[in-house]
Amino acid sequence: MHLKAAKEVIISGGAINSPQLLQLSGIGPASLLQQLGIDVQHDLPGVGENLRDHYATRLTASVEGVQTINDKAHGIKLIGEVAKYCIGQQSILKLGPTTVFCFWRSKPSLTNPDVQINFTPGTHQRGMQSTLEKKSGFTLATWQHRPESSGYVRAVTNNPFDKPEIQPNYLSDEEDQRVILDATKLCRKLMQTDALKPFQVKETYPGTAIQNDNELLHSIRDIGQSIYHLMGTCRMGPINDPMAVVDDQLKVHGIDNLRVIDASIMPTMISANLNAGVLMIAEKGADLVLGKSPLTMSGLQGQIT
């Protein structure tokens, strides 16, 4: 069976699937495609490169004299929380995973914050995010907004059902290491503020025995994890940029009637979760496909009610 597009093909597989699909279709780094026995349709070195993500680490602490989610998520107390939820009362089941957000500049010279810290009134067992600990505690999770470290996504066979190789290269850039270390140290300072002293806060991870930067960085690598903000693997850029994959119309360089519309086209990481940015890419991409002209300020005001 052969299927042909009447107008154009739109790929919206995300930062992992889109570059793999292009590579399997013969669009990507020629050396990789030849190694996999894939006929090269167009040598495009940037396909699968520039993978970026938000990498988070966390600090946990135990507390005394106050109930956290941990205390209410087990046994009879959990049944009570479910009952409260069912009758519309305040309950831990109505809480999101984060109740307080903090944005911080790791250097005074920065115009915008480059660090985010999330506070959660609970802690989970290591390696088991769905299982809360039984002792009272809280978590501070932190990550860098605009990491310089980048990795890649590469097909490993010519079989579309085989998963690609994903190498994010977290914290490979020295500036990223500085930022995450400074952010972690700030979290420690927040734990020791006067406002928290009545609750006898005791750091449980990485623990107060970990003090020098090398040890702290090791613990960050040990417990850190993706925030699932993967992007950049089909980056947008001008045709004279050897690593660019799509143009400003989201069309793949050198290929007719083929677009990529998803987070993979972002050339750099945004200072936020990706959801809003991806929604905007989708809205703009839809307008490009339909051939709509960009809105003017007067036209935009006419649409606001």
Task: Annotate each PLM feature.
Residues M1-V82, S91-I92, T296:
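Glycine-rich loop(s) and the adjacent beta-strand/alpha-helix scaffold that form part
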Residues E64, E81-G277, G285-T305:
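FAD-dependent oxidoreductase catalytic-site/capping-region signature
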